[in-house]
Amino acid sequence: MKIGIIAYQGSFEEHFLQLKRAFDKLSLNGEIISIKIPKDLKGVDGVIIPGGESTTIGLVAKRLGLLDELKEKITSGLPVLGTCAGAIMLAKEVSDAKVGKTSQPLIGTMNISVIRNYYGRQKESFEAIVDLSKIGKDKAHVVFIRAPAIAKVWGKAQSLAELNGVTVFAEENNMLATTFHPELSDTTSIHEYFLHLVKG
């Protein structure tokens, strides 16, 4: 199994480590690679889009030709996990809590509406307990950093976890989106769930 992590910025190194732990926990053999240009996608079984600055990631991916390639592969069924900025990238609808509608480059394959900076810029980061029982896991201690919120899900998209009534983890077919940073959590639950999705 080969998993690629978009490695322009953000906590991609932490995703590497968390993914390795998840592979070990599930007794799976896996290869983890960095993805920066379209040819890096060759032969990957799943992709992680980490946190960072969603507009920057989108612009760089577009300039290097990766954005369209990702969209095509994800639409064709390539499993993907988008965390924080990655969740924004996957959303079909994006707005900003302060400035409203945005025109940033997106992959835009998932039936979710995301609000950037939902918790306000002054609340840069916070930690919370999230119930992961819908994926057969225990509650998890997770980290939110300038987090967005999934304001709406529709079609085949469904909410897998909420915090104070707001969706923080959603799934649609081959796509997973979290508004928190599972790579900074003390549990590998989200990465394990992603690997099960990749494994089929």
UniProtKB/Swiss-Prot annotation:
Pfam families recorded: SNO
Keyword Transferase: no
Residues involved in L-glutamine binding: G52, E53, S54, R116, I145, R146
InterPro entries linked to this entry: Class_I_gatase-like, PdxT/SNO, PdxT/SNO_CS
CDD domains given in the database record: GATase1_PB (cd01749)
EC number annotated for this UniProt entry: 4.3.3.6, 3.5.1.2
UniProt key word Ion transport: no
GO cellular component, one term: glutaminase complex
Listed GO MF terms: glutaminase activity; pyridoxal 5'-phosphate synthase (glutamine hydrolysing) activity
Self-association state and partner proteins as the record states: In the presence of PdxS, forms a dodecamer of heterodimers. Only shows activity in the heterodimer.
The protein, known as: Pyridoxal 5'-phosphate synthase subunit PdxT
Organism: Saccharolobus solfataricus (strain ATCC 35092 / DSM 1617 / JCM 11322 / P2)
Gene: pdxT
